[in-house]
Design a protein with these regions (language model features):
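Non-catalytic terminal/accessory segments
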Residues: 1-202
Length: 202
């Protein structure tokens, strides 16, 4: 029974988090291979991770426990029962995978009369994103600028403030802070460039 299997596995996440540890071990190996610039090894380890049962369990758990878990995509599907979650784990594959269209909704901007658009993927697409993020994160965090703090794992606004303070506290430090915003940044990301240059399963 797939529902019982999920319930048993889900319980193990709390009592014996072995599935998560297995994924984290492979992520550590990916980060080490990235540091050593062994890109073929990075690809092999990334393939192993994204095709492992433990990583698929973790990906489904991520998308069924976050804030958007009650918001469906264009297919109207949600994974709420144990059976649905385990079936999702067993069905996750990149074989002939094609992402479905995004569901577009508009939410109010805080303190403004205008609304901003949000694109909602299906649960399956979210799980695939979470699965591949597990492989991409150790690469990104190993190679990223150490002075970058936005949308980074284990980094927050307080870290950015602390770094700014360190840069400005000396007598000969810079005396100017420039604030800028890139208009439509995420709407204009060059996805083709990313596909060509990210060393994962090219």
């Amino acid at each position: 029974d797939v529902g019982w299997e999920w319930a048993k596995t889900n319980e193990l996440f709390f009592i014996y988090p072995g599935q998560k540890r297995m994924s984290e071990y492979t992520q550590t190996r990916i980060a080490k291979a990235t540091q050593e610039r062994k890109w073929n090894l990075v690809k092999r380890l990334s393939y192993l991770l994204t095709h492992s049962h433990s990583a698929k369990l973790l990906a489904v758990r991520i998308v069924t426990r976050n804030k958007g878990r009650r918001t469906p995509g264009v297919d109207g599907e949600l994974w709420t029962s144990a059976s649905e979650k385990m079936r999702a784990v067993l069905s996750l594959t990149d074989h002939q995978y094609r992402a479905q269209p995004l569901r577009r909704i508009y939410i109010p901007k805080p303190g403004k009369t205008t609304k901003r658009p949000i694109s909602i993927p299906t649960m399956y697409d979210r799980a695939m994103q979470a699965l591949y993020a597990l492989a991409l994160q150790p690469i990104a965090e190993t190679t990223a600028d150490t002075r970058s703090f936005g949308f980074r794992l284990y980094r927050c606004a307080q870290d950015a403030s602390r770094y700014a303070y360190t840069c400005l506290r000396g007598k000969s430090s810079n005396s100017w802070i420039l604030e800028g915003d890139i208009k439509g940044c995420f709407d204009n990301i060059a996805h083709e460039w990313l596909r060509e240059h990210v060393p994962v399963l090219r």
